[in-house]
């Protein structure tokens, strides 16, 4: 689950992570009042108006503006609220701006990158710091890897003092900045582990001319599998920032990711799902989604999966590709038949079932009286997908 910048900063602040003063606003009038409050409290000649959407690259898209008065903030907020920001992370459809963060201006001296995430290859948390603040960390790692330091942190022992100091020294911090930097890194790691985050990213981490170390931006992603331990975080979810179909899928515990293709796919198992997407591509189509119904696919699960796939109007055909290991093929076939009867399939459906009770499943499909297209093997499935697209 993703949350907004202002929500992430609010959580981090509880753990002692230094963040600028900021106030969220849902209207131009609220933005003006927030700015007036900040100007009264601070000595900075500017405040920052920041669009709150679940995507990076807001500055380049016009989603971050400086203002020198509450009146100017009001004008900016009027123009920004309700507009659609298109960044490299939103896709061409963009995201509508529904809320703003009004934040105190900073007297910035240096900008850095700081992030913590899980390294699955080593089963450790990894602390990453870079002198290239404000840049995409993937780009830094590829083009200037010498400017990026990765420190493996064993979750059994946690972040050690020498590791936090190593990171601060790599960034060139000295004196008061160094002490504040080490304190900041310690606090961020504590927050990351306590809230079961999958990512805690500060980009940029800034050092002011006064020696303060603060999170100018914050991105927090939660591990969905640990959300039961943090019921209070559920209220932070902003479903308007999520794809409606992905949100519906999450309510049915389906692993669904919407793509921009024309062939829907329903598969059991992530590996087979990715292989199926390659198969669709080779057949001349483009996958419209990733959908893993899991090992315990039931008729109800299959029906919900079909509803979600058909919610994408770009879908011209559907490929069901199931290997019956834990789940029986006849059970999946029953779900496909039931779904076809209940929701009225309007596009060709190619069904390839292999494994436990595959013959029984094939017989059920043949005797269903429905226009379901059975496939024998992957090659046959690919050819039938190709044929379905040609006639669509």
Curated annotation (Swiss-Prot):
Could you tell me what this protein does? Succinyl-CoA synthetase functions in the citric acid cycle (TCA), coupling the hydrolysis of succinyl-CoA to the synthesis of either ATP or GTP and thus represents the only step of substrate-level phosphorylation in the TCA. The beta subunit provides nucleotide specificity of the enzyme and binds the substrate succinate, while the binding sites for coenzyme A and phosphate are found in the alpha subunit.
State the family named in the UniProt similarity comment for this chain: Belongs to the succinate/malate CoA ligase beta subunit family.
Q: Which UniProt keywords apply?
A: ATP-binding, Ligase, Magnesium, Metal-binding, Nucleotide-binding, Tricarboxylic acid cycle
Q: Know the name of this protein?
A: Succinate--CoA ligase [ADP-forming] subunit beta
Q: Which gene encodes it?
A: sucC
The protein's annotated pathway: Carbohydrate metabolism; tricarboxylic acid cycle; succinate from succinyl-CoA (ligase route): step 1/1
Q: Which GO terms describe its biological process?
A: succinyl-CoA metabolic process; tricarboxylic acid cycle
Binding annotation for substrate = 268, 325-327
Against Gene3D superfamilies, the record matches this protein to: ATP-grasp fold, A domain (3.30.1490.20), ATP-grasp fold, B domain (3.30.470.20), Succinyl-CoA synthetase domains (3.40.50.261)
EC numbers listed for it are: 6.2.1.5
InterPro entries linked to this entry: ATP-grasp, ATP-grasp_succ-CoA_synth-type, ATP_grasp_subdomain_1, Succ-CoA_synthase_bsu_CS, SUCC_ACL_C, Succ_CoA_ligase-like_bsu, Succinyl-CoA_synth-like
Domain of life, per the record? Bacteria
Q: Which residues of this UniProt protein bind ATP? A: 50, 57-59, 103, 106, 111
Q: What is written in the cofactor note of this entry?
A: Binds 1 Mg(2+) ion per subunit.
A single GO cellular-component term from the record reads: succinate-CoA ligase complex
PANTHER family for this protein: SUCCINATE--COA LIGASE [GDP-FORMING] SUBUNIT BETA, MITOCHONDRIAL (PTHR11815:SF10), SUCCINYL-COA SYNTHETASE BETA CHAIN (PTHR11815)
* GO MF entry, a single one: magnesium ion binding
Q: Which organism is it from?
A: Chlorobaculum parvum (strain DSM 263 / NCIMB 8327) (Chlorobium vibrioforme subsp. thiosulfatophilum)
Q: Which residues form the ATP-grasp domain?
A: 9-248
């Amino acid at each position: 689950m993703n949350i907004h910048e202002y929500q992430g900063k609010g959580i981090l602040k509880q753990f002692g992570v230094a963040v600028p003063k900021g106030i969220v606003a849902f209207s131009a009038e609220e933005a003006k009042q927030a700015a007036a409050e900040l100007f009264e409290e601070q000595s900075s000649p500017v405040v920052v108006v920041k669009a709150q959407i679940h995507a990076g690259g807001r500055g380049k898209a016009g989603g971050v503006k400086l203002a020198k008065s509450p009146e100017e903030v009001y004008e900016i907020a009027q123009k920004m609220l309700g507009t659609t920001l298109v960044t490299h992370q939103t896709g061409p459809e963009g995201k509508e701006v529904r809320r703003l963060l009004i934040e105190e201006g900073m007297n910035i001296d240096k900008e850095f990158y700081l992030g913590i995430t899980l390294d699955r290859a080593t089963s450790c948390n990894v602390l990453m710091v870079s002198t290239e603040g404000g840049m995409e960390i993937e780009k830094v790692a590829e083009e200037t890897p010498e400017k990026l330091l990765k420190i493996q942190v064993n979750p059994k022992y946690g972040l050690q003092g020498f590791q936090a100091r190593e990171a601060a020294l790599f960034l060139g911090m000295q004196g008061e900045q160094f002490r504040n930097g080490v304190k900041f890194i310690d606090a961020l790691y504590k927050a990351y582990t306590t809230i079961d985050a999958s990512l805690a990213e500060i980009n940029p981490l800034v050092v002011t001319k006064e020696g303060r170390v603060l999170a100018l931006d914050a991105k927090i992603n939660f591990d969905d599998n640990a959300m039961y331990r943090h019921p209070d975080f559920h209220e932070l979810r902003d479903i308007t920032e999520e794809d409606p179909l992905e949100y519906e899928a999450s309510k049915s515990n389906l692993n669904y990711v919407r793509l921009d293709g024309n062939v829907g796919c329903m598969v059991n198992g992530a590996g087979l799902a990715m292989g199926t997407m390659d198969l669709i591509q080779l057949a001349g189509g483009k996958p419209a989604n990733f959908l893993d119904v899991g090992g315990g696919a039931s008729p109800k699960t299959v029906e919900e999966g079909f509803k979600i796939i058909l919610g994408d109007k770009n879908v011209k055909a559907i490929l069901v590709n199931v290997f019956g290991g834990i789940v029986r093929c006849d059970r999946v076939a029953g779900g496909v038949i039931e779904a076809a009867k209940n929701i009225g399939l309007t596009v060709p459906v190619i069904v390839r079932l292999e494994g436990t009770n595959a013959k029984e499943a094939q017989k059920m499909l043949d005797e269903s009286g429905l226009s379901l297209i059975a496939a024998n093997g992957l090659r046959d499935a690919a050819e039938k997908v190709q044929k379905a697209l040609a006639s669509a």
